[in-house]
């Protein structure tokens, strides 16, 4: 799509050299054929380092844009990006008349399973009744897909993974831009989900696809039932994520992190290796590894327990 066509679609002024835009991408990962955007002051430090062909940016940050990057000035880069994401969204349904599939002879596929185009299914894989396997999905050797699992397009699943009933892998993340009237506009997600080897995902758990790149669950991690993992998350090796945990978008967990039941994170933060978050702990900041945390606001679990004891004693005296 031509940059001039994008400008016209967004009702923005552009008089520079016309170039072809092939995709949308993040500030630091966009290349010379892609368009990016900067949606707030916290990201302005990355503008001078972008390799994008073009950028959506507000007037006040125009001077930070590299000289080789074309500029589209907009009052709301995030909202403009949301409108544009629909144009670049991948098709949800493949209309090809014939499907190309690579299914190992040893794989066992039960009745009422849908398998999309360009799907690779490894040796000794078991796919139980009612599962949905979207286009461009790969499933590694000896993985087991339980009844009614949904695996959306472009998902990559490693070897010896277990996906329990009704989990959903690769659905769109929860991302919206808002206008001045408070109306919400969907941001379409073109990334995917990668589950590395030996990952287990519990029943009715949901793992959202990334906006641009990949939501990654690294090898050996075990996820309980009824867990939500948001878009762009990176979950380290051998983590344990207990039931009803919610991990917000772009959170990073190091290796062997334990998230207790009903714990949660806010987005865009990091939890260090070998940390433990006690049940119902609410993480709202980066945490150093190797320690046990609890409560909200999050603190060392031992301090949280002391605080609860002091509060109890206070009320007992009164």
Swiss-Prot record:
Gene Ontology MF terms: N-acyltransferase activity
Assembly and oligomerization: Homotrimer.
PROSITE patterns named in the record: HEXAPEP_TRANSFERASES
Cystine bridges: none
NCBIfam families registered for this protein in UniProt: lipid_A_lpxD, PRK00892.1
Cellular component terms (Gene Ontology): membrane
EC id: 2.3.1.191
Similarity section: Belongs to the transferase hexapeptide repeat family. LpxD subfamily.
Catalytic reactions of this protein: a UDP-3-O-[(3R)-3-hydroxyacyl]-alpha-D-glucosamine + a (3R)-hydroxyacyl-[ACP] = a UDP-2-N,3-O-bis[(3R)-3-hydroxyacyl]-alpha-D-glucosamine + holo-[ACP] + H(+)
UniProt entry keywords in alphabetical sequence: Acyltransferase, Lipid A biosynthesis, Lipid biosynthesis, Lipid metabolism, Repeat, Transferase
Record-given protein name: UDP-3-O-acylglucosamine N-acyltransferase
Function per UniProt: Catalyzes the N-acylation of UDP-3-O-acylglucosamine using 3-hydroxyacyl-ACP as the acyl donor. Is involved in the biosynthesis of lipid A, a phosphorylated glycolipid that anchors the lipopolysaccharide to the outer membrane of the cell.
InterPro entries per record: Hexapep, Hexapep_transf_CS, LpxD, Trimer_LpxA-like_sf, UDP_GlcNAc_AcTrfase_non-rep
GO biological-process terms attached to the record: lipid A biosynthetic process
Organism encoding this protein: Campylobacter jejuni subsp. doylei (strain ATCC BAA-1458 / RM4099 / 269.97)
HAMAP family found in the cross-reference section: LpxD
Known pathway: Bacterial outer membrane biogenesis; LPS lipid A biosynthesis
């Amino acid at each position: 799509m031509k940059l001039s066509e994008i400008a016209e679609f967004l009702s923005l002024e552009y008089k520079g050299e016309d170039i072809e835009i092939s995709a949308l991408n993040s500030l630091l990962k966009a290349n010379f054929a892609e368009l990016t955007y900067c949606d707030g002051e916290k990201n302005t430090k990355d503008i001078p380092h972008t390799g994008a062909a073009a950028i959506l940016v507000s007037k006040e940050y125009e001077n930070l844009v590299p000289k080789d990057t074309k500029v589209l000035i907009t009052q709301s880069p995030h909202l403009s990006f949301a409108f544009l994401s629909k144009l670049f969204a991948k098709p949800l349904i493949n209309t090809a008349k014939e499907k190309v599939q690579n299914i190992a002879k040893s794989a066992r596929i039960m009745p009422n399973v849908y398998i999309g185009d360009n799907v690779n299914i490894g040796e000794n894989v078991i796919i139980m009744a009612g599962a949905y396997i979207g286009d461009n999905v790969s499933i590694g050797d000896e993985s087991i897909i339980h009844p009614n699992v949904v695996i959306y397009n472009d998902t990559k699943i490693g070897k010896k993974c277990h996906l329990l009933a009704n989990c959903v892998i690769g659905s769109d993340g929860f991302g919206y831009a808002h206008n001045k009237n408070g109306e919400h506009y969907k941001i379409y997600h073109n990334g995917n989900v990668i589950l590395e080897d030996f990952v287990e995902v519990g029943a009715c758990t949901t793992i959202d696809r990334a906006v641009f790149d990949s939501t990654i669950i690294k090898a050996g991690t075990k996820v309980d039932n009824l867990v939500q993992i948001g878009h762009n998350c990176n979950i380290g090796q051998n983590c344990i994520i207990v039931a009803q945990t919610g991990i917000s978008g772009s959170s990073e967990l190091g290796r062997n992190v334990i998230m207790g039941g009903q714990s949660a994170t806010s987005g865009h933060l990091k939890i260090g290796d070998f940390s433990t978050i006690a049940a119902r702990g609410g993480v709202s900041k980066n945490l150093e590894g190797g320690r046990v945390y609890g409560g909200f606001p999050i603190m060392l679990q031992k301090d949280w327990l002391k605080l609860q004891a002091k509060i109890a004693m206070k009320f007992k005296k009164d």
